[in-house]
Amino acid sequence: MSVSAFNRRWAAVILEALTRHGVRHVCIAPGSRSTPLTLAAAENPAFIHHTHFDERGLGHLALGLAKVSQQPVAVIVTSGTAVANLYPALIEAGLTGEKLILLTADRPPELIDCGANQAIRQAGMFASHPSQTLSLPRPTQDIPARWLVSTIDNALAMLHAGALHINCPFAEPLYGDMNDTGLVWQQRLGDWWQDEKPWLREARRLASDKQRDWFFWRQKRGVVVAGRMSAEEGKKVAQWAQTLGWPLIGDVLSQTGQPLPCADLWLGNAKAVTELQQAQIVVQLGSSLTGKRLLQWQATCVPEEYWVIDNIEGRLDPAHHRGRRLVAKIADWLELHPAEKRKPWCVEIPRLAELAWQRVVAQRDTFGEAQLAHRIRDYLPEQGQLFVGNSLVVRLIDALSQLPAGYPVYSNRGASGIDGLLSTAAGVQRASAKSTLAIVGDLSALYDLNALALLRQVSAPFVLIVVNNNGGQIFSLLPTPQSKRERFYLMPQNVHFDHAAAMFNLRYHRPENWEELESALAGAWRTPATTVIELVVNDTDGAQTLQQLLAQVSHL
């Protein structure tokens, strides 16, 4: 019997089973122990293959692919710390709902906890963060192939959102020519190999029931809060809220067009809060809210009912309101709960939103970080998409910009870390093949710098704007100790990104005014390549501008 040959047949069943559940993208890192899985993926024509030398970046690449494709994405890594590097992407997927299938090669049981090289306790190492964990046995013909395929089918059928960790131990030898070992074992699956359906088909009902008293609540004074959702859902939510006559507070990731822009500014005005207190019901569609003032209002509002609708399970309401948690796709829920045409009941909030917008527009000419956030709408590629980083940049765009309704916007706003942002953006571009604008801070870019390797070959223009404010200026908005702020919070690195771009053979610009930025963008959108644009801005101007605008709007 050839161990290596049977390992490959075992792996081939696993990979083929994945195709029956919509897996098309497979992300592969180099490794020896993962050879059976890698070869099985490479030989399966159903897959689009992606490779990267860094497992942490690979996990985030898969995350970006899953965000756009809305299908599960598989990741193959070798044993040891390679597996641990998937943790950040796994955690993010668990919070934002993308489906990741993590295929982690492992040493066989007899090599664990005995000093063997590259052998760690992988089974269950991700604790409660995966939606499901499956620890497979060592490949053996004593276990029928139908057990293996039905086990994979069951796990995937139960995967509503988040990650599935499949730990796959393989004994040596890992290399060798294929022979007939295990062929009969494999052939017992019969015509399943020529079919396109899962071996085991399970149905799981997730659709939310219609709220029978909706006809009553839609006649009340309501507020719509829009969190993370798809572009199509964003347009539908905007129309739904407009028909109801309810004010819509749209997050930067809502893609609703934010009809009441600058919400994070005007929510700091007591007049707005007083008017919102008249709401009898708040309907929140989508989770992962960004704005600080929005979260503060959400935490203190006390409507008669607070409904949260999202396709992800769990409470998703850090303020723990009395109300209803409805698990459903937003578009499906809207169809079940149609709006009734009513006059808008809010008068003060539209006025404050317009005045806040005017205050922001008045400062747009200064070349700075806050002004870039406001102007970002003007720089979006036609028929393209936007990827927004974390920390200060996403807060500035949320507070100061008004993105077009239905324009695709992506971000990692689950755990909201700055790790893996460039890798995620690369996945977003690969899955869509659209022109992509990504905007991150300098520390975020440094954190994931080797992801520039993923951006060397793109299928459409990709522009990476690095806002270099020399450190983590988000901490300038927080009451961090002044004497300790620079060394222990901001951590300025005093670097530029021209050499990084050159190392990966990427185009590079460092504009010093809006005209130079617009010229660089115009050239970048004509070229199917990656362009790094570094905006060197005053360290604290972005945070200070936001604070000044908050103070101005609060006194309107």
From Swiss-Prot:
PANTHER family: 2-SUCCINYL-5-ENOLPYRUVYL-6-HYDROXY-3-CYCLOHEXENE-1-CARBOXYLATE SYNTHASE, PROTEIN PHYLLO, CHLOROPLASTIC. Homodimer. It is an enzyme of class 2 (transferase). Its cofactor is Mg(2+); Mn(2+); thiamine diphosphate. Binds 1 thiamine pyrophosphate per subunit. Keywords: Magnesium, Manganese, Menaquinone biosynthesis, Metal-binding, Thiamine pyrophosphate, Transferase. Catalyzes the thiamine diphosphate-dependent decarboxylation of 2-oxoglutarate and the subsequent addition of the resulting succinic semialdehyde-thiamine pyrophosphate anion to isochorismate to yield 2-succinyl-5-enolpyruvyl-6-hydroxy-3-cyclohexene-1-carboxylate (SEPHCHC). Pfam families: TPP_enzyme_C, TPP_enzyme_M_2, TPP_enzyme_N. InterPro entries: MenaQ_synth_MenD (IPR004433), MenD_middle (IPR032264), THDP-binding (IPR029061), Thiamin_PyroP_enz_TPP-bd_dom (IPR012001), TPP_enzyme_TPP-bd (IPR011766). Its EC number is 2.2.1.9. The gene is menD. One of its GO terms (biological process) is menaquinone biosynthetic process. Belongs to the TPP enzyme family. MenD subfamily. It catalyses: isochorismate + 2-oxoglutarate + H(+) = 5-enolpyruvoyl-6-hydroxy-2-succinyl-cyclohex-3-ene-1-carboxylate + CO2. CDD domains: TPP_PYR_MenD, TPP_SHCHC_synthase. It comes from the Bacteria. Pathway: Quinol/quinone metabolism; 1,4-dihydroxy-2-naphthoate biosynthesis; 1,4-dihydroxy-2-naphthoate from chorismate: step 2/7; Quinol/quinone metabolism; menaquinone biosynthesis. GO terms for molecular function: 2-succinyl-5-enolpyruvyl-6-hydroxy-3-cyclohexene-1-carboxylic-acid synthase activity; magnesium ion binding; manganese ion binding; thiamine pyrophosphate binding. This is 2-succinyl-5-enolpyruvyl-6-hydroxy-3-cyclohexene-1-carboxylate synthase. The keyword Lipid biosynthesis does not apply.
